[in-house]
Amino acid sequence: MAVAGPEIERLIQLLARLPGLGPRSARRAALHLIKKREALMVPLASAMQVAIERIQVCKTCGNIDTQSPCTVCTDPRRDPAMIVVVADVADLWALERAKASNGRYHVLGGTLSPLDGVGPQDLTIDALVQRAHAPEVSEIILALNATVDGQTTAHYITDLLQEANVKVTRLAHGVPVGGELDYLDEGTLSAAMRQRTLF
């Protein structure tokens, strides 16, 4: 038996598709939006309409922005010699929030995952190889997750870049800032020991 009209049920169903929102959370979010119609729902709908009309994928790096090439690619303060390779836009944004890189980026659109049917043709690896051959590029930084799929992707890209005249590096893996050794898994501790640095 339906508790609300089909329009409200549709709103709940659509909200439930968002990451981190299940049916109960979606219902609460829908009720909150409806209660705050003028203060929240109307501005949100307007912002979403603008996003639909203006946001696009950068043809150079794969970032999302209101222009292509994106703001990062056109920033003259960025180091054109360095390309940071990430799996998705969320990873790019995380590095930007941390102010961890002054280079340019390349968004793969995921990682290789044979079990999920994701092969090289499904990612922007060919475009990365083309960019790596540009004369101004001297380093490719693989900022991929330390998962099996992330490491598989990193090895695959490294093999493809053998002929390019670039240094290929990857992010260090190990003990997080504020982390306690007792709570870390064996793989993380092992990687931290192998990648230790002078103090």
Swiss-Prot record:
Matches recorded under Pfam families: RecR_C, RecR_HhH, RecR_ZnF, Toprim_4
Domain Toprim: 81-176
Keyword terms, alphabetized: DNA damage, DNA recombination, DNA repair, Metal-binding, Zinc, Zinc-finger
Zinc found in the keyword field: yes
Zinc finger (C4-type): 58-73
GO BP field: DNA recombination; DNA repair
Nuclease among keywords: no
GO molecular function list: DNA binding; zinc ion binding
Described purpose of this protein according to its UniProt entry: May play a role in DNA repair. It seems to be involved in an RecBC-independent recombinational process of DNA repair. It may act with RecF and RecO.
Listed PANTHER family: RECOMBINATION PROTEIN RECR
Family: Belongs to the RecR family.
Protein name, per record: Recombination protein RecR
